[in-house]
């Protein structure tokens, strides 16, 4: 387990629900990655992420799926892609990511608490 944080620190992390609207391979990445565009609703808009999630996910099965992401990290250039959000998932001992999803469809942009 990582070191404990306070509720005030956790509360600074802006975690939101969004819907994937486009997916394509990041051809410039050293490790297989996808460029994922996510619609977070009117307040935040559409943001993109470069994500190493190709073991289970591709354009066909990810487009239209709701995901959960950290929206207030600084932008980061990853293999020529400006990554604006961090899509959340569990990572197993081999580095394979399983995305976190809501159990029911909900409005884009809703905060996760």
Language-model region placement:
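Phosphate-backbone binding interfaces of nucleic-acid-interacting proteins
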Residues: 1-113
């Amino acid at each position: 387990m990582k070191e404990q944080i306070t509720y005030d620190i956790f509360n600074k992390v802006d975690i939101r629900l969004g819907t994937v609207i486009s997916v394509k391979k990041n051809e410039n990445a050293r490790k297989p990655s996808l460029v994922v565009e996510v619609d977070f609703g009117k307040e935040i808009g559409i943001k993109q992420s470069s994500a190493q999630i190709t073991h289970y996910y591709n354009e066909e099965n990810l487009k239209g799926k709701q995901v959960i992401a950290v929206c207030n990290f600084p932008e980061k250039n990853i293999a020529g892609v400006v990554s604006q959000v961090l899509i959340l998932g569990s990572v197993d001992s081999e580095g394979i990511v399983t995305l976190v999803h809501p159990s029911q469809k909900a409005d884009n942009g809703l905060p996760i608490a």
